[in-house]
Amino acid sequence: MSDPVASAPRTKRVVRIVILVALALLALPYLLTILYGGGQPVSTLMLWRWATGAPVSRTWIDIENISPALPRSVVAAEDAKFCSHHGIDWDSVRDVIDDMQDGEASRGGSTITQQVAKNLFLWPGRSMIRKALEAPLALWIDFVLPKQRILEIYLNIAEWGPDGQFGAMAGADYAFGRSAAQLSAKEAATLAAILPNPRVRSAKAPGPGVRRLAATYVARARAAELRQCWRENRES
């Protein structure tokens, strides 16, 4: 029969180890964010697909080489206040809370920075635990990385096709048979219109809903001047 007095220290050691491992896992994304100021990071979904043998297609492209219409369209579609918030759009958060209190379907309030946090370090799907982890990560990412770099990462890790097409290059090649550097304003807006559901919406064979969204984003993208955003971000 085991001695409860002797087993108590072992139990405490196990608990300490578990706590230390949990703290290390929580700290890892914050350390990796600093390293992701450079390089070509991949998403957790890409890693999972590689691990399970599912197809993954991704070719990194620097944001300077992407057709300017695509980052403008994505900002117009996904996060109109991208240049002015600090990782979280609190107005959108309040709208989501109001929707929940009124019993209405949530419109979603994730910024591009929050989506980068989720894609790089967390998991897809709706979860309060994930949201609780995502919020401080988004604030940290916005603090550590320039806006231009955040958007560059997003454009290279977003899922843009039904068969493992990740990033703007793979998405543009799948939908239009061309490089992300060669996208027209309409093509860029069409790619933006299928986010964040490329398995449900298609840029290759867009339905009426996608075409309507794309037409809206073409107009909005003309007003999304990002050069000033990059300058202001560097000066702040």
From Swiss-Prot:
Gene Ontology MF term list: pentosyltransferase activity; peptidoglycan glycosyltransferase activity
Subcellular location(s) per record: Cell inner membrane
Record-listed E.C. numbers: 2.4.99.28
Primary subcellular site in the record, as a coarse category: membrane
Database matches in InterPro entries: Glyco_trans_51, Lysozyme-like_dom_sf, PBP_transglycosylase, Pep_trsgly
PANTHER family cross-referenced by the UniProt entry: BIOSYNTHETIC PEPTIDOGLYCAN TRANSGLYCOSYLASE, MONOFUNCTIONAL BIOSYNTHETIC PEPTIDOGLYCAN TRANSGLYCOSYLASE
NCBIfam families listed in its UniProt record: mono_pep_trsgly (TIGR02070)
The protein's name: Biosynthetic peptidoglycan transglycosylase
